[in-house]
């Protein structure tokens, strides 16, 4: 004879759902997510992730645009803002964000990130980095900028690799 077991309803209760939500892991209410934006095209792909995190946790987004001479970083920041506004309109949710201009350019913005996040009055709870690009010889010898941020940051760092054809040296 076959033995059949009764299946139990294993759907989470309301208390379990609240305990497992993203905000109870690392983002407290009123915290911020630091999103650096450089001239690389891959930066735009962070828009989906930072928008999702802001919607689910109620965190404030700080878009830190690199102070470049060209218009690529500015264009990437504008594309991220457009994505945030589109999602906010579609869902009817409020997503708060602000745009700041960094002191450094796209090649030196990483050195500024840990200074911003580690200040005593900083509400930043997470830094969102893109770690997918073509690495040069200096990255192989001295380490990539993402590794510098991870080693010196006082807040969690989330690395995003949007391209399957490239890899991250920080994995």
Give the label of every model feature segment.
Residues 1-26, 117-171:
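Gly/Ser-rich helix-loop-strand patches that form or flank binding pockets
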Residues 84-85, 105-120:
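A short, acidic, amphipathic alpha-helical segment used as a generic capping/interface helix at domain edges
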Residues 99-103, 161:
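Short loop/edge segments at beta-strand edges and connector loops
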Residues 18, 46, 109-110, 142:
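Amphipathic coiled-coil/heptad-repeat helices and related helical stalk/stem segments
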Residues 69-73, 104-106, 135-136:
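Short, small-residue-enriched loops and turns at beta-alpha junctions
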Residues 51, 111-115, 147:
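Active-site phosphate/pyrophosphate- and oxyanion-stabilizing loops and adjacent acidic/basic residues
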Residues 9, 14-17, 24, 28-99, ...:
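Small/aliphatic-rich secondary-structure junction motif
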